[in-house]
Each structure stands twice: as C-alpha cells, then as structure tokens.
Amino acid sequence: MDRWTRGATISLACGMLLALSSAPAFIVPPADPGTAKGVAAGMIFAGGAVEIAAGLFGIHRERGRTDVVLGLLSVATASILAFAGAIGAMGFLFLLGAWLLARGAIELMGGLAAETLAAVAAARLIRGWMDILVGLVALIGSLAAAFPLLLLSWPGTIVRSALLFVAASLLASAGLHIWLAAWFGRPGRSPRG
C-alpha cells in the first residue's frame, strides 16, 4: 500500500470516527448540565484524539499541524469540562462558544496558510467560518441566558444546543477527512496535484 492510499485510509477512518463521536448529541437526552458536561467532554476528547491522529498519520501530513493544534485545543477543552467543578449551563455554553471560536480561527489560519491544493484550503475556510458562526451563536445564547425571562426553559435548551454545536463541529471535521480520503484515494492523486 503506497503512502497516499494508506493516508487516505487513515483519513477515512478518522472521518468516520469523528462522525461517530458526534452521535451522543443525538442519542443521549441531557437530564442535567452535569450529565451533558460529561457527554460533551467525552465527545470533544474523542474528536480531539482523532484529529491528533489524523494530523500525525493522515493524508495531508504537510498540513497536519493544523489538525494537531485543533486536537490539542479539543483535549484541553474536554479536560476543563471534565475537571471543572460546578459549572452551570451558561458557563458550559460560554466555554463551548469560546472553543468553537478558537477552532474557527485556527481553521481560517490553516486555510489561508495552505500552500497546496486549493480545495483543501477552501474546505478549511468554510469549516472555520462555520465554527465561528456556531461559536457566536453559542456565546450570544450564553449572554441571552443572563435574562432568564427570555428563555423559560433555558438550561435544557442551552444544554441540548451545546451538544448539537459540538456535534456540528465534529461532523464538519469528519466531512473534511472523508472528502480528503475520497479525493486522494483515487489512483494518481496526491496533495501536490
């Protein structure tokens, strides 16, 4: 198996694992913010570990630094979520919004710094803007929660939307890796052409 086929296989596996790590957002009903924190921390940690692996061993090793940095950011965020004491629904959503904004900024920088294959750069730019948009929605939602009369059942709404924000980010990352696998898995394709 040549380098590109092996890299495409790894990228496909990473994409599928990222998609699977988003499943708890759709399956687990958040009973309380504590349970949702644990679920989100697990999802983010799993996604971060997969992104680190994709950056180190995937098809686009030359630009894998971006994936490694995103993975490290995700692992750090998951650690904060898992080991932070009492963090309420508003703080939970604020932390996830900040995480998404940071991911979006890193994706944008990675897309702008890409030297080869404009399609990968474009995919990173699109994903970066998506993370920034979702992060802004999360931050605005956490600020709106300061006015509890606006949202009568805001803790449950915030917790559910926070899990969906994490799932959206993981699915976007999965899409990028699956697309890379499909593109480079064909004979004669390489990141240089």
Locate predicted features.
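Structural signature of hydrophobic alpha-helical transmembrane segments
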Residues: 31-46, 90-101
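Hydrophobic alpha-helical transmembrane segments in multi-pass integral membrane proteins
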Residues: 79-86, 132-149
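Membrane-proximal helix-loop-helix units in multi-pass membrane proteins
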Residues: 81-127
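Cytoplasmic-side transmembrane-helix entry/capping segments in multi-pass membrane proteins
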Residues: 62-73, 121-126
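N-terminal membrane topogenic signal
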Residues: 1-14
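Hydrophobic, membrane-facing alpha-helical anchors
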Residues: 15-24, 37-57
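Membrane-interface helix termini and inter-helical loops of multi-pass transporters
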Residues: 27, 144-158
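C-terminal ends of transmembrane helices
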Residues: 49-60, 108-116, 178-182
